[in-house]
UniProtKB/Swiss-Prot annotation:
This is YcgL domain-containing protein HCH_02617. Pfam families: YcgL (PF05166). Residues 6-90 form the YcgL domain. It comes from Hahella chejuensis (strain KCTC 2396). HAMAP family: UPF0745 (MF_01866). InterPro entries: YcgL-like_sf, YcgL_dom.
Amino acid sequence: MTPDRRLISIFRSSKKEEMYVYVDKKQGVGALPEALLQLFGKPQHVFDLLLTKEKPLARADAAEVMSAIDEKGFYLQMPPVQDDYMMDVVRAREQTPAVGRKDLDD
């Protein structure tokens, strides 16, 4: 059974921007699976938080976080999904040299 509140620690990934792992503060990151650590990199402590089911979180549901910590020992918050098409447009623009009016007239 998931407790009504839990003191958790939040760690940022050293490999992937906007990826975080939430763990019970008492447990820490020592019990995280090796496969997760390979993907995640060295955990960088962000802060500790007293979490309740009703606590609003930016990109996660508090009850889901608490349940995952209870069941698996951690909750992994993945980076937000970006629109692949727009990222392709931005990358293409960055790789295309600027063309001026004079270049077009030649």
